[in-house]
């Protein structure tokens, strides 16, 4: 019984980080600003998203000027940034500007609420 409890505890500790974030990857842009992304289109494209499990977890995560790159390379894979997800920049009161590349073809509802 003790072994089973330890095994369950170990699995919980290992798997917990996998469900702790809503974003799939985080990458610094050329200006050193960390931008959070989710995979879209079967993992071939990216959408800008918020940090944390819920957009309210880290209000004001994005501040100042944010330049979204056209492409992002992570783990030797380059993917195009094609959208800005729901609530990606919501409640970022210190955000002064966002530069959006031509590769972005859709902006979700309430992305800039």
For each predicted feature, which ranges?
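Hydrophobic h-region of N-terminal signal peptides that target proteins for export
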Residues: 12-21
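Sec-dependent signal peptide recognition
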Residues: 5-11
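Boundary at the C-terminal end of the N-terminal hydrophobic targeting segment
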Residues: 20-32
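Short, Lys/Arg-enriched N-terminal segments with co-localized hydrophobic residues
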Residues: 1-3
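Short, ordered beta-strand-loop transition motifs
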Residues: 29-45
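Non-globular, low-complexity intrinsically disordered regions
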Residues: 47-51
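Consensus positions within tandem repeat domains that build extended binding/scaffold surfaces
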Residues: 85-88, 108-113
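Structural signature of tandem-repeat unit edges
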Residues: 41-43, 61-83, 93-106
């Amino acid at each position: 019984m003790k072994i089973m409890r330890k095994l369950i505890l170990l699995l919980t500790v290992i798997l917990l980080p996998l469900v702790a974030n809503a974003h799939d990857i985080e990458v610094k842009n050329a200006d050193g600003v960390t931008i959070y992304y989710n995979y879209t289109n079967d993992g071939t494209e990216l959408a800008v998203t918020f940090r944390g499990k819920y957009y309210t977890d880290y209000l004001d995560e994005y501040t100042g000027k944010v330049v979204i790159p056209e492409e992002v390379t992570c783990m030797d894979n380059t993917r195009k940034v094609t959208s800005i997800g729901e609530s990606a920049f919501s409640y970022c009161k210190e955000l002064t500007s966002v530069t959006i590349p031509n590769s972005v073809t859709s902006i979700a509802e309430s992305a800039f609420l």
